[in-house]
A protein has these predicted regions:
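Substrate-binding/active-site clefts of carbohydrate-active enzymes
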Residues: 98-101, 106, 110-250, 255-283, ...
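Short, well-ordered beta-strand segments enriched in hydrophobic/aromatic residues
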Residues: 16-18, 525-531
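Core domains of carbohydrate- and sulfate-ester-processing enzymes
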Residues: 62-95, 182, 201-216, 324-353, ...
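The feature marks proteins involved in alpha-glucan
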Residues: 1-11, 15, 36-108, 113-118, ...
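Conserved alpha/beta catalytic core and glycan-binding cleft of carbohydrate-active enzymes
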Residues: 80, 268, 272-448
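Glycan-recognition and catalytic regions of carbohydrate-active enzymes
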Residues: 340-357, 412-413, 418-427, 452-526
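Short proline/glycine-enriched turn/loop motifs at strand-loop junctions of beta-rich domains
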Residues: 19-25, 533-535, 543-544
Length: 571
C-alpha cells in the first residue's frame, strides 16, 4: 500500500506521495511555488512538481496553513523542524559479502563522540584502528535525524533522514563504502518502537500512534489499529532503504519488546522477511529483554542482544546487586550465562518478582550478542562510568576475556579496547522547555541515590564533550589483550565455532573461580580460567598438553593464577 510514497526524483522534477488521512488539503511548497497534491484512496496524496532537482528544499503545507517536513524526508539540513531536501543517493552500493553470522565481532560506536570531529568522514579515518583490533562489524548507533546536533539518536523523528551534524546521507554513504573497503560490515541501530517528542509531526498526518499501549519513552506506534498498514509500511520501507540504498549489512532493532503488535503477522516477522528478500545476506538483530527464542525461531530474526552475561559479569566484578542486577549474585549465574546465554529461563527473577525467560534449547551461540559494556549499560548510569572505572583495569580485563572466549557473538563499546575511562554520559540538544524537563527527569531518576544535584546536565554541551573518546590513549596493554583474544577467536576452532553444545562452564564460589571449556569436532580445545577474587588460586585443572595463549597477569611458577586475572589455554 505504500508504493510510491515519499519524494522521488524523476526526469524534469520530482514526485511526492504522502499518507495524510487527517488533512483536507496537502501541498508542496518549493522554489517559490505551492503545488497542490491530489487525494487518492485511503488518505494518500500524490502529485508532481516540475523543475526540482537534488539539493532543492521543500515543505509540505497541511490544510493551507501548517508547514511541515516530509515524513519520508531523506535529509533535514536545517534541523527536524525545517524544510526537507531532495536527495539523489546515486547508483546502488557495490556488493559486499557480509561475514557469516558466527564470524561477527561487533564494535558499537556513536558517530558524534567516536572522534573529536563527530562526523562520518572522521570516523572513516579511524577504520584502520578497527581492522587492526580484529573486529568484523561496525554497529552504528542511530543516525535518523533528531533535534539539535547532540544526542544518542534514540529520540529520532525523521526516520529516513540521516542526521545532518554527522554528514547527512552523502556522508553516511561514504562511511559505509569506506567500511566495506576496509573489509568491515556495517550494522545500523534503528528505533521503531517510538519517536522522540521534539519535531515529531507524524500525528498531524495520520494515526501513527496508539493510546492502546505506551512505552517508557512516549506513545506507542500504531502497528495493529486502523491505518496501521501505512504505519507498518513506513517502518518496512525504512528498513529496506538502509540495506539497499546505503548498503548497510544488518540492522539492530532497538527494544523490540516495546513494539506492541497483535496482528496476525507480527511486524518483526514481516520486517525480517523484507530485509532478507531485499538484500540476501543482510541480517537483523533485535534487542529484547523478554528472553523469547521465538524472535529467531518464529519471526526469523538472526540474533538477539543478550544482557544476562553482562549482568552476571557486572555483579561478579563490581559487587553491585541493585535493580536488575538482583538475581545475579551467585557466581553460578555467570557460569550459566556462559553456557546457556540466558540465566533466567523460566525461574523466579527477583527484579521482576515473577518467573522470567524461556530455555533457548536448540539455538546456537551465534544467535546471542554479548558484551561487558555497551551504550545502555554505561550511559544509563548517572555518571556514565566505564567498567574499567567501576571495577578497575584488572577485573575489566577478566570480563573482556570471558566475553571474547564465550560461545556467543562479542560486542565491544567504543574505547573499551584500550580501557577508556572517559564516561559515556546521557546528552541531548533540546530547546529550553524540553531541556528543563529532561534535566529534572534525569535528576529525579537518581534522587534515591542522593545524586540529584550532581547528575550532569544532559543539555550542557560540556556533557557531550566529556563523552568523546580520548584517542591519545588508543594503545597499550588493554588493546594488545583484545587483539590477542580476537586473534585466538579467529584461529582456534574451539573458540570461534559458537557451539553452545560443546561448551561447559563451572563456578567455584568459595575460591571465586570460573572455568570455561570449549571444544570442536576437529579436536580443538580451549580452557579459560577466571579468578574473580583478590587472592591467587591454584589452576583447577591439569594443563597437560594445552598451551598458554593469554594471561592478563603473570602465572606463578607453581601454577597459581593471580587474583583478578584470567588465562586462556588452547591445543
Amino acid at each position: 500500500v505504500t508504493e510510491g510514497l515519499g519524494p522521488r526524483l524523476v526526469e524534469g522534477g520530482a514526485t511526492f506521495g504522502v499518507w495524510a488521512p487527517k488533512v483536507t488539503s496537502l501541498a508542496v511548497r518549493a522554489g517559490g511555488r505551492v503545488v497542490e497534491l491530489e487525494r487518492h484512496e485511503r488518505g494518500v496524496w500524490r502529485g508532481a512538481v516540475e523543475g526540482l532537482a537534488a539539493g532543492d528544499d521543500y515543505l509540505l503545507v497541511l490544510d493551507g496553513q501548517r508547514e511541515r517536513p516530509d515524513p519520508r524526508s531523506r535529509f533535514q539540513p536545517h534541523g527536524v523542524h525545517g524544510p526537507s531536501r531532495l536527495v539523489d543517493l546515486g547508483p546502488p552500493p557495490a556488493p559486499f559479502a557480509t561475514p557469516a553470522l558466527r564470524d561477527l565481532i561487533f564494535y558499537e560506536l556513536h558517530c558524534g563522540t567516536f572522534t573529536p570531529e563527530g562526523t562520518f568522514d572522521a570516523a572513516a579515518g579511524r577504520l584502520g584502528h578497527l581492522v587492526d583490533l580484529g573486529v568484523t562489524a561496525v554497529e552504528v548507533m542511530p543516525v535518523a535525524a533528531f533535534p539539535g546536533s547532540r544526542g544518542w539518536g534514540y529520540d529520532g523523528v525523521a526516520l529516513y533522514a540521516v542526521h545532518a551534524a554527522y554528514g547527512g546521507p552523502d556522508g553516511f554513504r561514504r562511511f559505509v563504502d569506506a567500511c566495506h573497503g576496509a573489509g568491515l560490515a556495517v550494522f545500523l541501530d534503528v528505533v521503531y518502537n517510538h519517536l522522540g517528542p521534539d519535531g515529531n509531526y507524524l500525528g498531524e498526518f495520520g494515526p501513527y500512534f496508539t493510546d492502546r499501549a505506551t512505552t517508557p519513552w512516549g506513545d506507542a506506534v500504531n502497528l495493529d489499529g486502523p491505518g496501521s498498514d501505512f504505519v507498518r509500511g513506513l517502518i518496512l520501507d525504512n528498513a529496506e532503504q538502509w540495506v539497499t540504498g546505503y548498503g548497510v549489512d544488518g540492522l539492530r532493532l532497538d527494544a523490540v519488546h516495546e513494539l506492541h503488535d497483535r496482528s496476525s503477522v507480527h511486524i518483526l516477522e514481516e520486517l525480517a522477511e523484507r530485509v532478507h528478500a531485499a538484500r540476501p545476506g543482510a541480517l537483523v538483530v533485535a534487542e529484547s529483554d523478554l528472553h523469547q527464542p521465538l524472535l529467531v525461531t518464529a519471526y526469523g530474526l538472526d540474533a538477539m542482544w543478550d544482557d544476562d552475561l553482562h549482568h552476571a559479569l557486572h555483579v561478579a566484578v563490581t559487587g553491585e546487586t541493585s535493580g536488575y542486577y538482583d538475581g545475579f549474585q551467585d557466581l553460578g549465574a555467570l557460569a550459566k550465562a556462559l553456557e546457556t546465554g540466558w540465566v533466567f529461563i523460566g525461574q523466579y527473577y527477583p527484579f521482576l518478582d515473577r518467573r522470567h525467560g524461556r530455555d533457548p534449547a536448540g539455538l546456537g551461540g551465534e544467535r546471542f550478542v554479548v558484551c561487558s559494556q555497551n551504550h545502555d549499560q554505561v550511559g544509563n548510569r548517572a555518571f556514565g562510568e566505564r567498567l574499567a572505572t567501576l571495577a578497575g583495569p584488572d577485573l575489566d580485563a577478566v570480563a573482556s576475556v570471558l566475553v571474547a572466549c564465550s560461545p556467543f557473538l562479542p560486542l565491544l563499546f567504543q574505547g573499551q579496547e584500550w580501557g577508556e575511562t572517559r564516561p559515556f554520559l546521557f546528552f541531548t540538544d533540546h530547546g529550553p522547555g524540553l531541556a528543563s524537563a529532561v534535566r529534572q527527569g534525569r535528576r529525579a531518576e537518581f534522587a534515591a541515590f542522593d545524586w540529584a544535584d550532581e547528575v550532569p546536565d544532559p543539555n550542557d554541551p560540556a556533557t557531550f564533550e566529556r563523552s568523546k573518546l580520548d584517542w591519545d590513549r588508543a594503545g597499550g596493554p588493554v588493546l594488545e589483550l583484545w587483539q590477542a583474544l580476537l586473534r585466538l577467536r579467529r584461529e582456534v576452532p574451539a573458540l570461534g565455532n559458537c557451539r553452545r553444545d560443546l561448551t561447559t562452564a563451572r563456578a567455584d564460589p568459595e575460591r571465586r573461580l570460573v572455568t570455561l571449556e570449549r571444544s570442536d569436532p576437529s579436536g580443538s580445545r580451549a580452557v579459560v580460567v577466571a579468578n574473580l577474587g583478590q587472592r591467587s588460586q591454584h589452576i583447577p585443572f591439569d594443563t597437560g598438553k594445552l598451551r598458554l595463549r593469554v594471561a592478563t597477569r603473570p602465572i606463578s611458577p607453581s601454577g597459581d593464577l593471580s587474583g583478578a586475572s584470567a588465562a586462556v589455554w588452547t591445543t
